[in-house]
Amino acid sequence: MEPEEGTPLWRLQKLPPEQGAGLLHKIIDGFCGRAYPAHQDYHSVWNSAEWKHVLEDVTTFFKAVVGKNFSEEETLQQLNQLNSCHQEAVLKCLKSRRNEIKQALLGEIVDISCAQLQDFDWQLKLALSSDKIATLQMPLLNLHLDVKEDDKVKPYTVEMSKEELQSLISSLEAANKVVLQLK
C-alpha cells in the first residue's frame, strides 16, 4: 500500500527501512538542540525541497505526539499508511526519546519569554467623567506588574476595561492549561 500525500511522515517511504531509525534519531537530535542531519547524506533519496519537508514533517509529528501525549495505539493510527519497518522505527525512537522530546518542548515554551512575574497589585476605579451631560460610569482596573527580566525588575502599569480584563483572564487560563498538560 502506497502512502497518501498528506498523511504524517508519508515521505519516509522513499527511505530504505534500514536507514529509518538513524534518520529519525538525527532529526530528534536537531530539534533537541544538537546538529540536524545533513541533506548531502540523503541527497540520493530526496531533493532539497523534499528534504525540508521531511525535516518539518518528522519534527512536527514527534512534537505533536509527545505534546498531546498520544498512546502507542493513537500513534499507530497516525502511521497506518507507512510500512511496518518504518512504523517500528518511529515507535522505537518515540519510546526511547519521549522524555528528551518533552524537555525540548518545555524548553521552547520557556524560551518564548524569559520574563517572570515577580509581583502585582491592582486597583479598581470608576470613571465618572464624560463629554456629554450624562455621566459615564465605567469601571477601570489599574494593574501594576513587576516583571523580572535578565535579573532586572521592570514595572509595568496597565489600565483595562471590564472586557479587556476578561480577555486577559481567559488568555492566562488557556496558557495555564497548556502548561499543566505538558507536565
Curated annotation (Swiss-Prot):
The keyword Transcription regulation applies. One of its GO terms (cellular component) is cytosol. It is found in: Cytoplasm; Nucleus. Residues 116-183 form the COMM domain. Keywords: Cytoplasm, Nucleus, Transcription, Transcription regulation, Ubl conjugation pathway. It comes from the Eukaryota. The keyword Cytoplasm applies. Scaffold protein in the commander complex that is essential for endosomal recycling of transmembrane cargos; the commander complex is composed of the CCC subcomplex and the retriever subcomplex. May modulate activity of cullin-RING E3 ubiquitin ligase (CRL) complexes. May down-regulate activation of NF-kappa-B. Belongs to the COMM domain-containing protein 8 family. Component of the commander complex consisting of the CCC subcomplex and the retriever subcomplex. Component of the CCC (COMMD/CCDC22/CCDC93) subcomplex consisting of COMMD1, COMMD2, COMMD3, COMMD4, COMMD5, COMMD6, COMMD7, COMMD8, COMMD9, COMMD10, CCDC22 and CCDC93; within the complex forms a heterodimer with COMMD4. Interacts with RELA, RELB, NFKB1/p105. Interacts with CCDC22, CCDC93, SCNN1B, CUL1, CUL2, CUL3, CUL4A, CUL4B, CUL5. This is COMM domain-containing protein 8. It comes from Mus musculus. The gene is Commd8.
